[in-house]
């Protein structure tokens, strides 16, 4: 009986750990979504700025810098999207483990 209680306690601790990790991943995903939006706005801003800059203003170097910045922001957006996909996959895996653990715990309780 003591082994069952000890095992149940360990399972509860593991379940709590997974639940907290799942919530942390959800917060990370939302943070990444915010960063994606921010960087997409920056890309739009740079596109708009680039429309106003003309060659007769003799700032070709500024255009080069703006294009470089735009590429950097686009890369960041891509990186955050990839990270979101990874986080979503981790959350799915944790949800499945939690579901399995909950079912195993219910079976264990029925045996008692």
From Swiss-Prot:
Keywords: Coiled coil, Cytoplasm. Signal peptide: none annotated. It is found in: Cytoplasm. InterPro entries: DUF496. It comes from the Bacteria. Residues 70-111 form a coiled coil. GO terms for cellular component: cytosol. HAMAP family: Pole_loc_TmaR. Belongs to the pole-localizer TmaR family. Pole-localizer protein involved in the regulation of several cellular processes. This is Pole-localizer protein TmaR. The gene is tmaR.
